[in-house]
Amino acid sequence: MRSKKLWISLLFALTLIFTMAFSNMSVQAAGKSSTEKKYIVGFKQTMSAMSSAKKKDVISEKGGKVQKQFKYVNAAAATLDEKAVKELKKDPSVAYVEEDHIAHEYAQSVPYGISQIKAPALHSQGYTGSNVKVAVIDSGIDSSHPDLNVRGGASFVPSETNPYQDGSSHGTHVAGTIAALNNSIGVLGVSPSASLYAVKVLDSTGSGQYSWIINGIEWAISNNMDVINMSLGGPSGSTALKTVVDKAVSSGIVVAAAAGNEGSSGSSSTVGYPAKYPSTIAVGAVNSSNQRASFSSAGSELDVMAPGVSIQSTLPGGTYGAYNGTSMATPHVAGAAALILSKHPTWTNAQVRDRLESTATYLGNSFYYGKGLINVQAAAQ
């Protein structure tokens, strides 16, 4: 009898242990968060006076992790799981929760464009971009290149903190088209005396979070840049990105952005972001015969065209190479803006844009060509 009682007690104890173990596993499973993703959390304008600490608390209380709070955009970059996203969308202080999308460089493969946009006519008059600051918001610039004069910069890529290293080559190529030096070697840029600033927002694979791009644009605003070149883009819109682009333009900066390399798709626009925003100058690509490049994105948002096929420019390591893309067309426009500002330093960014667009050479249907090919000689009159 005693043996039977002992066996029953042992069985009960084992049952209790297994029950507690499985109960604990269930609690752990239930408490495990879903896959976290990167988001941008925007706060309502009525909450603009809310302290940074309070904004951080709003996100943290929902289980989110704040990565960065912006200076000119009433928003923060954060890592959130699905539950936190749902709860933040219900919070009365939150205006929006949007995915922190990834933008990619617009370059396809592996120049003449300087003459095609008539930049030498201004060079011969002594206007070469002096005293104009151009922010190249891209993958960094190889500052050791003998054909480039990089005056400063910053990196917003967490894993690649040196803005003067360019693992993708993209930013260095873009920089050369804007301002390769007039020094008898290599190539000549549109605006060879302009001051280049390397604002790194794309990593060595040519990709970058929208939040990195926002940080880069904020840096350009804070450091009083005159021109911003963005040879990058993504397919998704962003309230935060639009806000900071608009802020840059309202601060007096000329903003040129690549339209994209998505070609045309019937009557649908294929222009990417941020070029799609009205405040930017959206740039498409043509070849040396002024024919639209087959890869050049089309849409009603397209503003102007510039050379973007077989563009020879600087590459890391003191070398040179030819690339194709609206990424290569855009720096022709940024360089042209710098040339105009060197001749007319009191002109506003709106005046520069208007002159570039109103004097462009008509090439065809605006859906595919915008206002046409820029003519910086005419624009600077």
Swiss-Prot record:
Signal peptide start-end: 1-29
The EC number(s) this enzyme carries: 3.4.21.62
Residues binding Ca(2+) 2: A275, Y277, T280
Keyword terms, alphabetized: Calcium, Hydrolase, Metal-binding, Protease, Secreted, Serine protease, Signal, Sporulation, Zymogen
Tagged with keyword Protease: yes
InterPro entries tied to this protein: Peptidase_S8/S53_dom, Peptidase_S8/S53_dom_sf, Peptidase_S8_Asp-AS, Peptidase_S8_His-AS, Peptidase_S8_Ser-AS, Peptidase_S8_subtilisin-like, Peptidase_S8_subtilisin-rel, S8pro/Inhibitor_I9
UniProt KW Iron keyword: no
Residues covered by the Peptidase S8 domain: 111-380
GO MF annotation terms: metal ion binding; serine-type endopeptidase activity
Entry annotation: catalytic residues: D138, H170, S327
Cofactor needs: Ca(2+)
Binding site for Ca(2+) 1: Q108, D147, L181, N183, I185, V187
One GO CC term on file: extracellular region
Disulfide bonds: none
Residues of the propeptide: 30-106
Cofactor binding: number and manner: Binds 2 calcium ions per subunit.
Gene3D superfamilies for this protein: Peptidase S8 propeptide/proteinase inhibitor I9, Peptidase S8/S53 domain
Compartments, as annotated in UniProt: Secreted
Pfam families referenced in this protein's UniProt entry, alphabetically: Inhibitor_I9, Peptidase_S8
Limits of the Inhibitor I9 domain: 38-103
GO biological process: proteolysis; sporulation resulting in formation of a cellular spore
Further remark: Secretion of subtilisin is associated with onset of sporulation, and many mutations which block sporulation at early stages affect expression levels of subtilisin. However, subtilisin is not necessary for normal sporulation.
Protein family according to the UniProt entry: Belongs to the peptidase S8 family.
Reported function: Subtilisin is an extracellular alkaline serine protease, it catalyzes the hydrolysis of proteins and peptide amides.
Entry protein name: Subtilisin J
Organism field: Geobacillus stearothermophilus (Bacillus stearothermophilus)
Encoding gene (name): aprJ
